[in-house]
Amino acid sequence: MPGSIRIDIVTALPALVEEPLQHSILQRAQESDVATLQVHNLREYATDKHRQVDDRPFGGGAGMVLKPEPLFRAVEAIEGAAGEADDIIYLTPDGARLDQSMANRLSMEGHLILIAGHYKGIDQRVRDLLVTREVSIGDVVLSGGELPALMLVDAVVRLVPGALGDSSSALTDAFQDGLLGAPVYTRPAEFRGHEVPSVLRSGDHQAIARWRDEKRLEKTRDRRPDLLPDTNNDSTEASSQ
């Protein structure tokens, strides 16, 4: 029985991707039919005897570029077997920034195909004619798109109903409501002179909720003020009325 979300990853380096999919939440999601995760070796879709998937860029320059033919064949074969994808995503530094809002939206789609670029990138015609969404993990360049693809898979699958043992866990993650997470503690209650805040041991659930909300707001204001409403603009607008 197929999972409620299917994600296919196309890569020239499948070994970088396959192993992490067999652990923790991603493994359990597959075993419980919540997710179907498939890795496709791009070289299997090359037709020359050397299984070449890259070539030198027109116009010169350093680096190699992934060829369009194998990428088109791979995506067309996947869609021929599993149906049309809701999104064909290329992982690239110049894509839209992956955030919790995007992960939430993607978790509601039924079928995603991820293209992990490598070398200098992929032929622009693949981006123009095949890709429907381009995603970045931030302003940093990695050797390839395999690690970003894994990050996207993990961020999305854990939001699919049934992926987590406690479904409320995903709802309390950082960024779900625009704030960073509160500090968390476990046993022992005292460690090297540092004690767990007494409110967390009080059993007063309302007080605990207030404490966590205060700490989340405090941390967000300190570390990521960009996530908070622009109170300065609000006050300026109010004073001008």
From Swiss-Prot:
One of its GO terms (cellular component) is cytosol. Residues 211-241 are annotated as: Disordered. Keywords: Cytoplasm, Methyltransferase, S-adenosyl-L-methionine, Transferase, tRNA processing. It is an enzyme of class 2 (transferase). GO terms for molecular function: tRNA (guanine(37)-N1)-methyltransferase activity. The gene is trmD. Residues 230-241 have a biased composition (Polar residues). HAMAP family: TrmD. S-adenosyl-L-methionine binds at G117. It is found in: Cytoplasm. It catalyses: guanosine(37) in tRNA + S-adenosyl-L-methionine = N(1)-methylguanosine(37) in tRNA + S-adenosyl-L-homocysteine + H(+). Disulfide bonds: none annotated. It comes from the Bacteria. One of its GO terms (biological process) is tRNA N1-guanine methylation. Belongs to the RNA methyltransferase TrmD family. Residues 211-227 have a biased composition (Basic and acidic residues). It holds the Pfam family tRNA_m1G_MT. Specifically methylates guanosine-37 in various tRNAs. Signal peptide: none annotated. Its EC number is 2.1.1.228. NCBIfam families: PRK00026.1 (NF000648), trmD (TIGR00088). This is tRNA (guanine-N(1)-)-methyltransferase.
